[in-house]
């Protein structure tokens, strides 16, 4: 299962469980901008709206969480739980400040950091063309030349989010698509 399908399944499952408890569930989908917003509702029939938005979601553009958090905050009223699911592959300079804003608004924030297992282990060999799910052009290279640097960068990114989330009291869950 690729990471987009993994994230869809995760969000659908969490939405289903929360709606079964009659909790209000909303959905905001974003890349560099807010692409779609389904306002929170607690009716079980609301699940079909969540599933529809997840089904039509197509990855595009660069993900910029720090630019979207303000838009999300403006749509949220009162306290609640905000769950962010992303691959967090871009290191954003002000993301810690934006996450702090969410916490200061009385929101309980949970982050699910989802990566494909191959993105973590980087098991590739020989000349390979890598294609982005977003808007980056394909690139051809020999993975052996960059494996160590790449794996260190991925681990640094995971550590960065784990550390900053812990400082802010945010639950951070790292998931690989193989789990």
Question: What residue spans do the PLM features occupy?
Answer:
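Exposed, interaction-prone extracellular/peripheral surfaces
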Residues: 1-179
């Amino acid at each position: 299962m690729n990471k987009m399908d993994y994230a869809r399944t995760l969000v659908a499952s969490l939405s289903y469980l929360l709606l079964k408890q009659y909790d209000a569930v909303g959905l905001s989908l974003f890349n560099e901008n807010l692409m779609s917003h389904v306002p929170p509702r607690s009716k079980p029939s609301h699940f079909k709206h969540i599933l529809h938005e997840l089904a039509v979601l197509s990855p595009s553009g660069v993900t910029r969480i720090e630019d979207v958090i303000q838009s999300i905050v403006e749509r949220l009223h009162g306290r609640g739980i905000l769950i962010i699911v992303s691959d967090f592959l871009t290191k954003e300079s002000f993301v810690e400040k934006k996450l702090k804003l969410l916490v200061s608004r009385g929101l309980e924030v949970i982050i699910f950091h989802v990566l494909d297992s191959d993105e973590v282990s980087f098991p590739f060999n020989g000349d390979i063309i890598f294609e982005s799910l977003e808007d980056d052009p394909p690139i051809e290279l020999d993975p052996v030349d960059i494996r160590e640097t790449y794996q260190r960068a991925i681990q640094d990114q995971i550590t960065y989010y784990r550390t900053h989330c812990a400082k802010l009291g945010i639950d951070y869950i790292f998931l690989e698509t193989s789990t």
